[in-house]
Amino acid sequence: GYPEFAVPAEIAKGIAAVGFDACSTASNHSFDRGLPGVRATLDALDAAHVKHSGTARTKEEADTPVIVSHGLKLGLVSGAYGLNGSTPPKGKSWAWSDIEADHLIKRAEAAKKAGADIVIVAAHSGLEYHHEPTEEQIRLAQRLTASPAVDMVYCHHSHVVEPWTRMNGKIVMYGLGNLVAQQSSNMPGTDEGVVGRVTFTVRSGKVSTTKAEYIPILIGSKNDGPIRIHAVDTELKSGMGNQARLKSAQQDISRTVTSLGVDGVTEA
């Protein structure tokens, strides 16, 4: 069978404390603890003032666009490829969002109608431990970016970094790797990840991508002690940490992110 995961509710406070104001909750593990687990997760995020997209406690919540305001309004739409063989309870399919393209586009359109200036789609998709996007990811990205309602797409699930590209003038990140994880050292690349930083320009309702930057990160000790996230470039410049490993991570990540030869994607 598949592994099942749960974490203490306090992690939501940590998510907020480091600066996240919204997140995707749609994944293949969304229902590892059933509908009570979905409710508990969203309750904890609400208590920490972190907005969320991808799972819901009610149909009304599922149908309400998720929008974060920071001057401009950013809409978040998310979905996942499956639930490891499980399904939401009968009559409650709204409790979890899949990545069927028409469904995601409809939600993106609803976010724009609700006032979002920019809409980002988060797709839990790909093949675990593979650095190349799957045909399904590519087809989904093509469909999504063809919609005027979608301004960017990013993916997660593979646990390793995947390439970035542009489709229909819009940034697509096929895989961001891991952010906080402690996977087996037999899985190369699972201690590497990227933080994306994208700058948008909105003029007369039209959205364009001004910058698309990636920040390489390396996850700390796999054996003992607390897990830490290391900003690769910062520690290389300061001489801190394992310089050889930091350098190889920087090279691995940069080679993968830019492997499709897309102009305008640079290391921050």
Residue spans for each PLM region:
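Acidic, metal/ion-coordinating pockets
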Residues: 1-268
